[in-house]
Amino acid sequence: MPAYKRVLLKLSGEALMGDDAFGINRSTIEAMVNDIAEIVKLGVQVAVVIGGGNIFRGVAGGAAGMDRATADYMGMLATMMNALALQDAMRHANIEGRVQSALRMDQVVEPYIRPRAIRQLEEGKVVIFAAGTGNPFFTTDTAAALRGSEIGAEVVLKATKVDGVYTADPKKDPSATRYTTISFDEAISRNLQVMDATAFALCRDQKLPIRVFSIVKPGALKRIILGEDEGTLVHV
């Protein structure tokens, strides 16, 4: 019996690279889609917000000297490429994925329309939200918090390459330990980089919990949906 009826899955663009240095690793994206298919079969309504850092990041070195708003719009276009790749992989897995974009690109994808997105979720389709919030200076983490709040998701599932939130960077500090649960306020006071501050504040204000987990850990997503202890739960 699923613990959640409707979830917002946040996928980072970097996670799509797999072991590659850039771009989209096909086997990695197929593995992600298989994980999503597992929970769709359980009757869970799934929406996805996808990043673009595997292609372009508005705040990264490649954007040095560039107008920040222009760089952010380029990052939004990168998320569109990832969203189309994810939708295509879903089609091969017999899942109907619908891409809705915060920036209009009508020949390619639908515009973001909240009632339509909710209806598609209720029909069992996976809705992929592209182009972040459609505004520069806002991250795709903030888009995940915003869209999760708008569609009435019960939890934001933040898929990363580490299996939760740690007391310190586990790659740099071998003594770092993982939190199983932590409050928003404690995470803020300890300056734990779960999400950027805007996304974090929005989730806290909307009482929308965040579960941080490893997308590369086999079966992790399904275990979360079944209510098992996986990753770190950030709560009010």
From Swiss-Prot:
Its EC number is 2.7.4.22. Pathway: Pyrimidine metabolism; CTP biosynthesis via de novo pathway; UDP from UMP (UMPK route): step 1/1. It holds the Pfam family AA_kinase. Keywords: ATP-binding, Cytoplasm, Kinase, Nucleotide-binding, Pyrimidine biosynthesis, Transferase. ATP binds at K10, L11, S12, G13, G53, R57, T160, Y166, D169. GO terms for molecular function: ATP binding; UMP kinase activity. UMP binds at G52, D72, T133, G134, N135, P136, F137, F138, T139, T140. InterPro entries: AceGlu_kinase-like_sf, Asp/Glu/Uridylate_kinase, Uridylate_kinase, Uridylate_kinase_bac. It is found in: Cytoplasm. Its main location: cytoplasm. SUPFAM superfamilies: Carbamate kinase-like (SSF53633). Inhibited by UTP. It catalyses: UMP + ATP = UDP + ADP. Catalyzes the reversible phosphorylation of UMP to UDP. Belongs to the UMP kinase family. This is Uridylate kinase. It comes from Cupriavidus necator (strain ATCC 17699 / DSM 428 / KCTC 22496 / NCIMB 10442 / H16 / Stanier 337) (Ralstonia eutropha). The lineage of its organism: Bacteria, Pseudomonadati, Pseudomonadota, Betaproteobacteria, Burkholderiales. The gene is pyrH.
